[in-house]
Amino acid sequence: MLIVLPPSETKTHGGSGKPLDFHHLSFPSLTKARQTILADLQALEVDEALKVLGISEKLRPEAESNRALETSPTMPAIFRYSGVLYDALDAATLPEKALERLAIGSALFGVIHATDPIPHYRLSGGTKLPTKSGELPTMKARWGTSISEALIDVNQLVIDLRSGTYQQLGRVKDAVTVRVESVMEDGSRKVVSHFNKHYKGELARVLALSEKEAHNAEDVMSIAQAAGLVVEENPNHKETLTLVV
């Protein structure tokens, strides 16, 4: 199984790895698109980047880091991204076998494996990044069907924990997806938004550490339930599971 996580806007700076080498990234079919997007992102002057990326002057260092994408140090992607989901995942305590089951969606790289070395960058899935010819394509248009095709080619069950924006960049037919819901006092259900990432991080950790391999949604549910999580099937869509918290 391959567990695909969403990226995070917050990232760890620095790193001790050599500068970015596209040949050291997984899913080589995405290389050409990666190179084009990176070149367009790196070409943005900082003031223009603030507007394009939709960030404030306070985050100017984020835009400045994009000017050095090919020269700045790298670190494994799983440690580059930070935030609520990654805190719950606690990748630093995962064995190598568990890390091999993890991938991450990315506006810049499409999808990468957890251990792929990447630099610090700022680019979200909803950004319209200008091309050298002045066009403003969406990230979805830039990636086309390439992310979907790359994930289909892994020939494993894909457990897609990406947020909607990143799923739009490359959906995977028959992938298992997960909704997070809480039970209200009156028994009704409410979709969890604020802590959604935390619970998905916990689920990703459980799945990554599992001694069993998942081949379908029922297997995913079984693994999660064995670890004490409350997971339910969706009678109307067998690939969609509900994590109840």
Swiss-Prot record:
Annotated InterPro entries: YaaA (IPR005583)
One BP term from GO: response to hydroperoxide
Any matching Pfam family: H2O2_YaaD
Listed GO CC annotations: cytosol
Name of this chain's protein: UPF0246 protein Cgl1995/cg2186
Family of this protein: Belongs to the UPF0246 family.
